Amino acid sequence: MSQFFYIHPENPQARLINQAVEILQKGGVIVYPTDSGYALGCMMGDKHAMDRIVAIRKLPEGHNFTLVCSDLSELSTYARVNNTAYRLIKNNTPGRYTFILTATKELPRRLMTSKRKTIGLRVPDNKIALDLLSALGEPILSCSLMLPNEEHTTQSDPEEIRDRLEHQVDLIIHGGYLGQEPTTVVDLTEESPVILREGSGSTAPFI
């Protein structure tokens, strides 16, 4: 059975943040809040935890995960960012966007797509998520918490999440009741941005 932490959305308790980081570092799978609903997360290099997330979501083989980063500097460690992309990302992070970028060699090979060496990255506008990332010291490997047969909305009610997933994850963080619309996905691998999915972030800056 999973642990269940009530963490204040504006003033996260450092003790609980540190306990959440310990769970991640021990191979745990967590549910945590972002600015676009709840997400499943684990350590970037933990294949077993990654496989557990695949099973929970019933994801197809080769599904693209996202690296949730603390800031633009950390994002730039794992992706090649040209001047145009840098400006667009800087002007729109933290925020409700996932950016598709060409991966650097710092990224574990299994996290890249097979046809194109790309990765999705984002910097969330959520205090709990940012405190987790700061305490962890590296990105969290994540995907939106969309359960099977409910692929168009992210889970927003942590009490309902506990009812459905308490035997499948190691920690659920209650950080408030959140929106249900996933991030807007923007491909920045070419000279001009391409909107791959319209979500909770405005597409106006990229058109």
Curated annotation (Swiss-Prot):
<dbReference type="GO" id="GO:0003725">
    <property type="term" value="F:double-stranded RNA binding"/>
</dbReference>
<dbReference type="InterPro" id="IPR052532">
    <property type="entry name" value="SUA5_domain"/>
</dbReference>
<feature type="domain" description="YrdC-like">
    <location>
        <begin position="14"/>
        <end position="201"/>
    </location>
</feature>
<dbReference type="Pfam" id="PF01300">
    <property type="entry name" value="Sua5_yciO_yrdC"/>
</dbReference>
<dbReference type="InterPro" id="IPR017945">
    <property type="entry name" value="DHBP_synth_RibB-like_a/b_dom"/>
</dbReference>
<dbReference type="InterPro" id="IPR006070">
    <property type="entry name" value="Sua5-like_dom"/>
</dbReference>
<comment type="similarity">
    <text>Belongs to the SUA5 family.</text>
</comment>
<protein>
    <recommendedName>
        <fullName>Uncharacterized protein HI_1198</fullName>
    </recommendedName>
</protein>
